[in-house]
């Protein structure tokens, strides 16, 4: 047992930090774009302004400098605190998780849409969906809004909860959680700058997310499968995910849809004429029934069951030290 003792202690600290961060976030949720977020965005713009000279390798350099600096400072502080007090190092982990992980960063959008659909207030549901996606939803019907809300929630739960949790559990200290969220943010800020006018500056930011998110995407999908209808989730994952516009996030969406037995994807319509005009041609993923307000509750249940599953796995490792 002495050989595995460091891993058991690490699992205990990880589990307790995750529980504390989730509880803190429920009591005092952070705004989506608070002062810390605005400061970080300004810092990334500063790095881009000084390192983007129109070449692909400048994007590589900017990404490595940004990630390397953040990880060096955070991990250095963690190990320095660990020499002083385990409690201080644990508190730093809780703080980093509080800043990088949480349901409340996206759940208010989902909950408000769920309430609007349940009340039959389509106009309010459209307005809320448009605000969440950053695109007009004025022509969408209730079924399309339900599908989009479920898709957005499954994607956000991966990016804000499971991806962070998995990387935090993989690397000691706060480095994994910070690396994951930073990679997503760099893709958001720089990933679209791949054209000739930018010299391919954003290519590496996109590639880095593919590498960093490869395992978490599949573990999130596996968690959904175990927490829901396993057979349908695996079937949809294997047969539908690759045909989604982004095959990687398609893994999470297909598995999640199969797990709760709902059909997602499918074209969105502008509502002109009896059948409408397709404005966003998307393949159908999932299996079972058409999406409606009731399936939004099923989505919440699936995400929470999957989270409990991962926490139980960490708890088993932690308890192993006493057996």
What are these regions (language model features)?
Residues 2-323:
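Hydrophobic N-terminal alpha-helices or hydrophobic patches in metabolic proteins across all domains
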């Amino acid at each position: 047992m002495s050989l595995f003792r460091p891993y058991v202690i690490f699992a205990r600290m990880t589990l307790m930090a995750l529980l504390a961060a989730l509880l803190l976030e429920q009591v005092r949720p952070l705004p989506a774009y608070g002062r810390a977020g605005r400061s970080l965005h300004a810092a990334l713009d500063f790095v881009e302004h000084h390192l983007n000279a129109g070449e692909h390798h400048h994007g590589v350099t900017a990404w490595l400098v940004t990630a390397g600096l953040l990880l060096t400072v955070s991990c250095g502080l963690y190990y320095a605190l660990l020499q002083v007090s385990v409690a201080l190092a644990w508190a730093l982990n809780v703080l980093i998780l509080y800043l990088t992980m949480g349901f409340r960063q996206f759940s208010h959008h989902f909950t408000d849409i769920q309430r609007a659909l349940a009340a039959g207030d389509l106009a309010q549901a459209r307005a809320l969906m448009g605000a969440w996606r950053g695109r007009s939803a004025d022509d969408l019907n209730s079924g399309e809004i339900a599908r989009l809300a479920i898709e957005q929630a499954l994607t956000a739960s991966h990016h804000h909860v499971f991806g962070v949790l998995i990387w935090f559990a993989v690397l000691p200290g706060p480095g994994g959680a910070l690396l994951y969220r930073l990679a997503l943010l760099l893709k958001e800020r720089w990933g679209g700058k791949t054209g000739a006018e930018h010299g391919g500056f954003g290519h590496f930011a996109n590639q880095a997310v593919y590498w960093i998110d490869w395992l978490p995407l599949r573990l999130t999908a596996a968690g959904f499968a175990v927490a829901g209808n396993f057979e349908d989730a695996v079937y949809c994952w294997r047969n539908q995910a690759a045909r989604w516009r982004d095959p990687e996030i398609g893994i999470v969406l297909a598995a999640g849809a199969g797990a709760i037995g709902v059909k997602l994807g499918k074209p969105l319509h502008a509502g002109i004429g009896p059948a409408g005009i397709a404005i966003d041609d998307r393949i159908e993923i999932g299996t079972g029934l058409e999406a409606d307000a009731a399936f939004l509750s099923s989505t919440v249940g699936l995400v929470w069951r999957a989270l409990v599953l991962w926490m139980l796995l960490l708890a088993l490792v932690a308890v192993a030290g006493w057996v």
